[in-house]
Amino acid sequence: MINTNNYRIIAKRVISSATSALETLSNNIPSDFNRIIEFLLSFKGRIILTGIGKSGYIARKIAASFSSTGMPSFYLHPAEASHGDLGMITRNDLVMMLSNSGETKELFNIIEYCNNSSIKIAAMTMNKNSTLAKRSDFLLKIPECQEASLIGTPTISSLIMLSLGDAIMTVIHEERGFTRDDFKIYHPGGTIGANLTKIKNIMRSGDEIPLVYEDTSFTETIIIMNKKRLGCTLVTDKEQNLIGIITDGDLRRNIHDQIHLKTASSIMTKNPHYISSEIFAQEALNLMKAKNITNIPIVDDNIIIGIIHIHDLLSMGVS
């Protein structure tokens, strides 16, 4: 019989090893870390990432993260570099090389080219005495660690490299004041792009807004709500100030023999929640979930300018 409990034991061993390695990295930030940060903060060129094997995949991810936060970056395959793509590297670039051993032969031609062309190199390696470390301008020495896999498959070393790359990226964009608005420019697609969409760009506005006045009759209120098909209407004064909201539930609670005497102001919920047009879609969704509401008005300078339904947000992938 298969001992399935062993699966969890192995999983815990791997995760425990990863946790321990990250703690070691946190306590042993590379001595050149501040130097590379100061350099990159004033850097105007491109950051070229390179590495082979698993280090190459980590390099690709770091390059993608740099680019998405406003630092032009791309991945250069070492083999392609040796067959003509070295011409993609200019004197204004920084080449960041990833190699656990620092003796990856496929990187040597790139090292030689950069050294001969006065192109700066940042080395991410475990071996401070390696060829790569000795011939680099910035040494990002990562802690020596044992892989979680019993056969030595890159696991922990890959995680450490990725984490250090993410740390560099995060420090740079925070120090530069890179905002979520900036991030949206470089990442308009997917869930991230949807979450970072400003409400003003997706709200219902103009004639799409269900509006009634304080003295609008119960019957007319029902007609307007049915026409706009949002399950609610906003209540406004003559200056377009928001004073209340009426939902389908409010209507049901007020249906009785005296409905012909009812006006919007007598059945509305006063002081409803509202948001600014400048907030992000994700913030709006979180508020609506927290308050258990399906519609929320958008108000700027005390004036109603729009409304958003929770389904509008969910349908565009906001989460």
Curated annotation (Swiss-Prot):
Residues 36-178 form the SIS domain. One of its GO terms (biological process) is carbohydrate derivative metabolic process. Residues 203-263, 268-319 form the CBS domain. Keywords: ATP-binding, CBS domain, Nucleotide-binding, Repeat. Disulfide bonds: none annotated. GO terms for molecular function: ATP binding; isomerase activity. The keyword ATP-binding applies. Pfam families: CBS, SIS. The keyword Repeat applies. InterPro entries: CBS_dom, CBS_dom_sf, GutQ/KpsF_isomerases, KdsD/KpsF-type, SIS_dom, SIS_dom_sf, SIS_Kpsf. ATP binds at residues 51-56. This is Uncharacterized protein RP505. It comes from Rickettsia prowazekii (strain Madrid E).
